[in-house]
Amino acid sequence: MVANNEIGVIQPIQALSDVCSSHGITMHTDAAQAYGHLRLDAEELGCALISLSAHKFNGPKGIGALVVRAGTQLQPLQWGGGQEQGLRAGTLPVPLIMGMAAAAELSMQDLEDRQARLQALRDQLWEGLKDRNPTIQLNGALQPRLAHNLNLTVPDVSGSRLHRALR
């Protein structure tokens, strides 16, 4: 998993991929939470397989992608059709595919500016909360972390009580 969906930490996928590769292990990573929030380079990550989910970057629900490094051997999920390079039989959902492609492109526009703004807001919120309540704990490292994510624990306050207070 490139980025954790709950606490937002970014994992060292390239280093993990290097270890797997040195032992002849095919590595897959789930990049669903990261795409649209980070610039991802499949070659740089070094994974043989990378999965994405369109709805995570404001695309349509029900469509995803599996990025497959050239030379990686896969077995078909279903026999009988030539779709998806012989890996899956059935009619391709063209409107979903087009929607995913458009969302993927849009999610990369102004990415650096958007992420810098979100990171500044996140860091300002974190500093303000710490100043008001020094017992608040950050779950996971502050860096590297997705810019839009701040996962906290407030000691001695139940999740339901905190939720009610934030309503």
Describe these PLM feature segments.
Residues 1-167:
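Pyridoxal 5′-phosphate
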